[in-house]
Regions:
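A residue-level marker of the well-folded mature domains of exported/periplasmic proteins
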Residues: 20-396
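Sec-dependent N-terminal signal peptides of Gram-positive bacterial secreted proteins and lipoproteins
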Residues: 4-22
Length: 396
């Protein structure tokens, strides 16, 4: 009977491991476009800076960034775009998260106020095939410009070549297709500094661990530049600290697998101190897995600030910190870059980036308001105020 029980336990663990795309191994950082930090500070006694004002990463082409807040429109620009009767389409890869919804709403508001007609907003539903179909439909509508993302930088080259060859201006956010050259094949690439986001998630975890312990990664196993950048930044930061070891990396191809990957890590390393996840939704799956085995003391850091992550941070749950996209500023920069393209306005550096917003419990309400330009829900505010006292919104 004991032998049978032991055999069943082994089989259960093997099934859990098989669900993840990577086994217990450390993935070597890719050749990131960002500078490599190779030396740990001699002493770190303060928490990492939350209000970050610099860009750490480079574009996929190795370009330095134009800060998004330097883009502006003159009165003459505004008048010209209103007189142009321009039509723009927005082709998204996914619309199931707060970050992308905010981007789209901001773009629509700014362009709409300038008299630009938004003729389509499409949802690719995290599918290259669906995005391709959407783009083909939009090309037939003959817009002046398309705002989109190369959700798969290789598989979507063909469809974006069709957009380019149709004479439609292209403004990308986050990812451009492989081989496309800024200023020639597309006008500009606008992105959050995702290298900076992964860097912050790593630095804050290291700080909470007092720079020693074991960590693991639940990462998105796909060729997506924005995800690869943050994951590689996490690895490189951890490599600086000799007393911190990444003991396991488990990759998922679909968010629904993230919990299974966390299960595998916790089965192999039940005492692991922290787990990083590529963004907040899989981080929630990691949290559920940890809770199921009584690991409520697990430290989780991630990227992106959805409402659930904000609530967990406010109540001092397992998610302790995130490197967040300044979604309103991202949307604003995308809209302005699109106007630049419509007017053939000069843009010296074609990579436009917004700095990461560092988020921890102490500043989660301010950070949320800064990222989205709306206040968090009353529930999140009440949770935070129970500890810190009355909050005054920076938007008031």
């Amino acid at each position: 009977m004991k032998k049978l029980t032991a055999l069943l336990l082994v089989l259960a663990m093997l099934v859990t491991l098989a669900a993840c795309t990577k086994k217990d191994e450390k993935k070597e950082p890719k050749d990131s476009t960002a500078p490599i930090e190779t030396k740990a500070p001699a002493q770190l006694v303060d928490a990492p800076v939350l209000n970050i004002n610099e860009i750490y990463g480079l574009s996929p082409e190795g370009q330095k960034a134009t800060l998004a807040n330097t883009l502006s429109l003159t009165d003459e620009d505004k008048a010209a775009v209103k007189e142009g009767n321009y039509k723009v389409a927005i082709c998204m890869h996914q619309m199931d998260n707060d970050v992308n919804v905010m981007k789209v709403n901001t773009i629509k508001k700014i362009l709409g106020d300038l008299g630009v007609e938004i003729i389509a907003v499409t949802d690719g539903q995290s599918s290259v095939e669906q995005m391709t179909t959407n783009l083909e439909t939009v090309i037939a509508m003959n817009p002046n410009a398309i705002i989109s993302i190369a959700y798969d930088v290789n598989a979507m080259v063909g469809i974006f070549e069709k957009v380019r060859d149709a004479g439609i201006k292209l403004v990308f956010f986050e990812c451009a297709p492989t081989g496309f050259v800024s200023g020639q094949d597309y006008y500009a690439l606008v992105s959050t500094d995702y290298y900076g986001s992964g860097r912050f998630a790593a630095e804050y975890m290291a700080y909470l661990l007092n720079y020693e312990g074991t960590v693991a990664m639940v990462y998105y196993d796909a060729d997506v530049w924005t995800c690869n950048e943050r994951d590689d930044a996490f690895r490189k930061v951890m490599d600086k600290y000799p007393n911190i070891k990444i003991v396991s990396e488990q990759g998922f191809a679909d968010v629904s697998q993230a919990g299974t990957c966390a299960d595998a890590i916790l089965a192999q390393y039940p005492d692991v101190d922290g787990i990083y996840a590529t963004w907040d939704v899989p981080a929630e799956e990691v949290m559920a897995s940890a809770s199921a085995v009584g690991r409520n003391d697990l430290i989780i850091t991630t990227v992106d600030l959805g409402d659930n992550a904000a609530r967990v941070i406010a109540e001092d749950g397992m998610i302790k910190a995130v490197g967040a996209a300044r979604s309103y500023e991202d949307g604003e920069a995308i809209a302005y870059a699109t106007v630049y393209s419509l007017l053939d306005k000069e843009l010296t550096d074609r990579y436009v980036a917004t700095p990461t917003q560092g988020v921890a419990r102490e500043n989660v309400l301010d950070a949320y308001a800064n990222c989205y330009q709306v206040n968090p829900s009353d529930m999140i505010i009440e949770i935070w105020e129970a500890v810190y006292g009355t909050w005054t919104s920076p938007l008031a």
